Amino acid sequence: MSTLGRSKTPSRDEPKKPGVFEKLSGTLSRKKKAPEDEHGNQGGAHHATDEDEVLELELEGREALDQSLVPVLARNIWLEEGEIRRYLTKETARDQKLAQVVDLLIYWLNEELADQRIVVRHLQEDLFDGQIIQKLLEKLEQIRIEVPEVSQSEEGQRQKLQIVVQTANRILGQPREQEKWSADLIHQKDFTAIIQLLVLLALHYRAPVRFPDNVVANVVVAQKEHGQVKTHRITEQITTVQTELAPKGTRDAFDTLFDYGPDKLAHVKTSLLAFCNKHLNKINLEVSDLDNQFQDGVFLVLLVGLLEGYFVPLYHFNLQVQSHEEKVKNVQFAFKLMEDTGLEKPRSRVQDIANGDVKSTLRLLHLLFTKYKHI
């Protein structure tokens, strides 16, 4: 665990969209294949064994994710008799979407635990003993997890971790013993087990991050039997389609509209679109997509100013947004302007708007509509 500076919000790879400035102004390298011998065999007299493959996967896979996962540890490479270990395939270790998931999880953990001076740098190295997971659950659930005093013995660590994992499973509504992220796997620093548990926790607590959709991890499972390493491959689902970011709470009209009223929802969107354009047209701007055009905060800042009867100077916010951080700053500025008008605190969160959560965006616009619909 490190106590260095906090991580910045990770940015997502997004296609560059045209800004509104013009309108406002005036209108890992792969190894070479071994040569074949005269019998068609590669690499000399012996074929690569399963154990060689496991060793190579451990070295190359971890190297590919070395910005957020621990360096290779010699004790993880060599299997004891009967031992089972899981390794990411080289292709999975180089998957940019998986790297995004790791970065987003680290960002979320550091944001949540900043007040406890905890900074996560490597998911496996920092979380395998369960202490950080315990701190996270205690904060978010406002509970105290009764665990034995800190033990230096491996068995003591496992017992403590077992209690923490069982608590997480109870909160998530999972079986008491969930084999996908068992205490044994997490204590082994199994990447897939740790990340699957963290993703479910992030979704359960509506973390203000949006994961890439449908990320999978291809995993090699290695087991040593009678002195020989046998392997097989499995695929583990890391993320699916993330439908909502907003925190859990009392259901409102928008929850009902999204669940049961697609026709009425379309009508509400049409009304909000007309409301926004009625005011944005005053400065030759127009919105066509409520779902996406407010997430960078530009239209939101300008709209709040127009509703209050003033034009927000362009140097007060980022007009041509280049990064996720600039989106967040713009939306934060818009929230500050709304607060200054005496508007009630929005249920939507800044990060939810910047991440493009549709329900949160519509809730916020409806809040403005309710106050300013007669202007």
UniProtKB/Swiss-Prot annotation:
It is found in: Cytoplasm, Cytoskeleton; Cytoplasm, Myofibril, Sarcomere, M line; Perikaryon; Cell projection, Axon. Expressed from 1.5 stage embryos, mostly within the muscle cells. In adult hermaphrodites, expressed in the attachments of other muscles, including the uterine, anal depressor, anal sphincter, and vulval muscles, as well as in the spermatheca and the distal tip cells. Expressed in mechanosensory receptor neurons ALML/R, PLML/R, AVM, and PVM. Localizes at body wall muscle attachments. This is Paralyzed arrest at two-fold protein 6. Its main location: cytoplasm. GO terms for molecular function: actin binding. Disruption phenotype: In mutant embryos, abnormal accumulation of cpna-1 into large foci in body wall muscle cells. RNAi-mediated knockdown results in impaired mobility, mitochondrial fragmentation and disrupted integrin attachment complexes in muscle. This leads to degradation of muscle proteins in the cytosol, myofibrillar defects and disruption of sarcomere organization. RNAi-mediated knockdown in L4 larval stage, causes ectopic membrane extensions from body wall muscles. Residues 99-206, 266-373 form the Calponin-homology (CH) domain. It comes from the Eukaryota. The calponin-homology (CH) domains are essential for its function during attachment assembly and the interaction with pat-4. Keywords: Actin-binding, Cell adhesion, Cell projection, Cytoplasm, Cytoskeleton, Repeat. SMART domains: CH (SM00033). Involved in the regulation of cell adhesion and cytoskeleton organization. Component of an integrin containing attachment complex, which is required for muscle development and maintenance. During embryonic development, required to recruit cpna-1, unc-89 and myofilaments to newly forming integrin attachments composed of integrins pat-2/pat-3, pat-4 and unc-112. Also required to reposition the integrin-based attachments so that they form the highly ordered array of dense body and M-line attachments that are characteristic of mature muscle cells. CDD domains: CH_PARV_rpt1, CH_PARVA_B_rpt2. GO terms for biological process: actin cytoskeleton organization; cell projection assembly; establishment or maintenance of cell polarity regulating cell shape; mitochondrion organization; muscle cell cellular homeostasis; positive regulation of locomotion; positive regulation of sarcomere organization; striated muscle cell development. InterPro entries: CH_dom, CH_dom_sf, Parvin. One of its GO terms (cellular component) is axon. May interact (via calponin-homology (CH) 2 domain) with pat-4 (via kinase domain). May form a complex with unc-112 and pat-4. Component of an integrin containing attachment complex, composed of at least pat-2, pat-3, pat-4, pat-6, unc-52, unc-97 and unc-112. Residues 1-51 are annotated as: Disordered. Belongs to the parvin family. Residues 10-20 have a biased composition (Basic and acidic residues).
